[in-house]
Amino acid sequence: MHTGQKQWVIFISMGLMLFGFVSLTHPTITDPCDQPLLPQGVTEFLAKKFPGWKILRLSDLHPENQRAWLDSEHRDKCPGVAVGNFETKEHFSYAVALIPLDRDKPSFQLVVVNKVKESYQHRLLVEPKYPANYYVIYKVPPGKYSDPERIENVQLSLDGIQMEQFHVGAILFYWKNGRYHRLIVDD
């Protein structure tokens, strides 16, 4: 191998090592909301019923809350979508955290969408409000849940929807007797 070729090989090797080091120290964060999360009919229903609103994405969260989400057991899920058997064991319901498309008007609302025969219906669980930081939502499994003081508890036979504001608290929404109820829970 000639001196020029050796220098070229060393140069390329150093570049590859440096590139590898940079990519290890700055991992690419993929947003779990990039993949299709809802059936097309639900997506179309939301676009028609809630123009000017979008589903909360990981990138919409404050950087500290992005880290908290990525460190949680829900890291592979979109913080603005929860899919589960919230109202019946026979079919899925779709909970979505909606925020305005206009970032200058921070707001938040929580909606659950169900397919009823050939159309969709929605229930508004949280009317538009103006939080300092957005809430995230996720599905919780059936089981026993209590408020922080252990005064009130509930046994869920269906999935629940947990709405959490990092470092503040969480509210559990659950279906009982034909409507949603809420319980403040430990986050």
Summary of predicted features, one role per range:
Residues 13-22, 26-55, 119-187:
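Acidic, small-residue rich beta-repeat scaffolds with periodic aromatic anchors
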Residues 90-92, 101-105, 119:
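Primarily extracytoplasmic ectodomains and periplasmic/lumenal surface modules that are beta-strand-rich
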